[in-house]
Amino acid sequence: MPSDSSVISNGHSNGSVNPLPNLQRTYQVVVAATQDWGIGKDGKLPWRLPTDLKFFKEITMKTSEPGKKNAIVMGRKTWESIPLEYRPLSGRLNVVLTRSGSFDIATAENVVICGSMSSALELLAASPYSLSIEKVFVIGGGQIFREALNVPGCEAIHLTEIQSSIECDTFMPPVDFTIFRPWYSSFPKVENNIRYSFTTYVRVRSSAAESAGQNIDPLLDNNSESMKFEVKDFSFLPKMISERHEEYLYLKLVQDIIAEGTTKGDRTGTGTLSKFGCQMRFNLRGNFPLLTTKKVFWRGVVEELLWFISGSTNAKVLQEKGIHIWDGNASREYLDGVGLTEREEGDLGPVYGFQWRHFGARYTDMHHDYSGQGFDQLLDVINKIKRNPDDRRIILSAWNPVDLKLMALPPCHMFAQFYVAHGELSCQMYQRSADMGLGIPFNIASYALLTCMIAHVCDLIPGDFIHVIGDAHIYRNHVRPLQEQLHNQPKPFPTLKINPKKKDIDSFVAADFKLIGYDPHQKIDMKLSV
């Protein structure tokens, strides 16, 4: 994909900046729009959002090279809607599109007039602009967006999503989500009683026509070749946007532990680098935080969570489905090593699912029917969310000191609290011990999925997932593979679709969950320490 001074020819990338007439600059769109794609009323913005204006100025003005500036491309009506004292917009090359030969401007400084979008992009691909202009941003209005939004030259769309209902008379075309995927979405903001958020969408495929030619089904298994992104490099994004991808929360924590972590011993004898007291916050409203810098075992995430929800403590249930993540802690050798010599192989004891569904019940073995025994915390969580959403005691705990000695492994992710506001469900989970290489990518996805499932059965929208970690550690034998992972650039997170017909937490099966747009880097092997 073209980068900072990129040009395209006949819809294809070209690394050259030679001023050939058939070459055009690529560009990014910056726009604020309502949920029905309204962008204006009576020739003006129908909202007053100072933070949005600040964002617009920052993204269109910032450059990575001090000697360069950005270009902003707009139609004549958009130009005229800018107050006279602010025209032209400072620090940027203002490119105004008009077919009117009599169009007059107050000053020629930093202003260029072009007759069409294509002629403007050709001009910006030619000298001197090919060398002096770093990025090109298209800023409106409606007709310009209709020409520019979903065509191959558009690399990204920086959209301020207005969630409040506001009357408009000017509209932009909808974003084509078959070719654009969300890169980053801010947490919602409220300003002047208007709720909104900032979202950047990046192009991942050449065109809707080419995607349609592949017969892409959005519910296909994510391993299908038809789900792979055509665009592999997203370095065209402004740095201020690129670094907001939420995967960097994880990557920066890993990098920090490798660089600054305390050397510690551990029960496995492997040795770790460790930091204490960390937090990551993920936005579940549009994306699903399944890491992309390595392939995460999605089927394993789903099946393990369903296993927890069922209350099962039998590792063989997962083994029969090809899920072997608990094999090490369920083996005969391991159970004997922790003093559970009378425990049947595969019986993990009163671990997560048992505590979620039968807290306080007396544990015998994995075969016993515990129906009606103990306290069903998960059902209690769902009932409180439905009946008393402002309750501050919506808690799910896997930590039961009485049962710890009976568990093959005490719970690492041990405590979750749920919170309802604005029709959204958020979850904060505390994890006492966090294996950053193998465990945390799984844990992030698992509790994000649990939050989405509970929101779904309670007719709420997923909100935030806040991951609080006590001992965040990297095993010594994971340092090298994690350093390999740190060299991978994140890709857009996928989105999650849940079967709308399922409304009972106990009714879900793995086929009820579909990922759309998961195209990670390759799997990176790391050895489990037990």
Swiss-Prot record:
Which GO cellular component terms, listed alphabetically, does the Swiss-Prot or TrEMBL entry include? cytosol; mitochondrion
Chain positions recorded as dUMP binding sites: 267, 413, 431-435, 443, 473-475
Residues bound to NADP(+) are: 32, 38-44, 76-78, 97-100, 140-147
Record region (Thymidylate synthase): 206-530
Q: Which family does it belong to?
A: In the N-terminal section; belongs to the dihydrofolate reductase family. In the C-terminal section; belongs to the thymidylate synthase family.
Q: Where is this region: Disordered?
A: 1-20
The protein's matches in Gene3D superfamilies, at most eight in alphabetical order, are given as: Dihydrofolate Reductase, subunit A, Thymidylate synthase/dCMP hydroxymethylase domain
* Known catalytic reactions: (6S)-5,6,7,8-tetrahydrofolate + NADP(+) = 7,8-dihydrofolate + NADPH + H(+); dUMP + (6R)-5,10-methylene-5,6,7,8-tetrahydrofolate = 7,8-dihydrofolate + dTMP
Instruction: Write the protein's name.
Output: Bifunctional dihydrofolate reductase-thymidylate synthase
Provide the function of this protein.
Answer: Bifunctional enzyme. Involved in de novo dTMP biosynthesis. Key enzyme in folate metabolism. Can play two different roles depending on the source of dihydrofolate: de novo synthesis of tetrahydrofolate or recycling of the dihydrofolate released as one of the end products of the TS catalyzed reaction. Catalyzes an essential reaction for de novo glycine and purine synthesis, DNA precursor synthesis, and for the conversion of dUMP to dTMP.
| SUPFAM superfamilies noted in UniProt | Dihydrofolate reductase-like, Thymidylate synthase/dCMP hydroxymethylase
Active site, renumbered: 412
* Record pathway: Cofactor biosynthesis; tetrahydrofolate biosynthesis; 5,6,7,8-tetrahydrofolate from 7,8-dihydrofolate: step 1/1
* Gene Ontology terms: biological process: dTMP biosynthetic process; methylation; one-carbon metabolic process; tetrahydrofolate biosynthetic process
Q: What is its EC number?
A: 1.5.1.3, 2.1.1.45
Entry annotated with the keyword Signal: no
Q: Name one Pfam family in it.
A: DHFR_1
Can you give the residue ranges of the DHFR domain? 26-203
Molecular function (GO) terms for this protein are:
dihydrofolate reductase activity; thymidylate synthase activity
The protein's UniProt keywords, in alphabetical order, are: Methyltransferase, Multifunctional enzyme, NADP, Nucleotide biosynthesis, One-carbon metabolism, Oxidoreductase, Transferase
* Residues engaged in binding substrate: 30, 52, 139, 160
Database matches in CDD domains: DHFR (cd00209), TS_Pyrimidine_HMase (cd00351)
InterPro entries referenced in this protein's UniProt entry, alphabetically: DHFR-like_dom_sf, DHFR-TS, DHFR_CS, DHFR_dom, Thymidate_synth/dCMP_Mease, Thymidate_synth/dCMP_Mease_dom, Thymidate_synth/dCMP_Mease_sf, Thymidylate_synthase
Q: Please give the superkingdom of this protein's source.
A: Eukaryota
